[in-house]
UniProtKB/Swiss-Prot annotation:
Keywords: Ribonucleoprotein, Ribosomal protein. Belongs to the universal ribosomal protein uL30 family. HAMAP family: Ribosomal_uL30_B. Part of the 50S ribosomal subunit. GO terms for cellular component: large ribosomal subunit. Pfam families: Ribosomal_L30. This is Large ribosomal subunit protein uL30. It comes from Lactobacillus helveticus (strain DPC 4571). The lineage of its organism: Bacteria, Bacillati, Bacillota, Bacilli, Lactobacillales. The gene is rpmD. The keyword Ribosomal protein applies. GO terms for molecular function: structural constituent of ribosome.
Amino acid sequence: MTDLKITLIRSAAHSLPEQRKTVKALGLGRVNSTVVLPDNAATRGALLKIAHLISVEEINK
């Protein structure tokens, strides 16, 4: 099973409201904040919405 390490690299301040809500729902706050989430379809779908704001790394357990 793998996890995803997600880092916010650009601010969501001037993004669409739906994108700002997605950033907040993933648990990302400020720029350079990082969260580790499970690699599943729901997470991948949310990441596609904000791909231009984040960087993603796979972590093997």
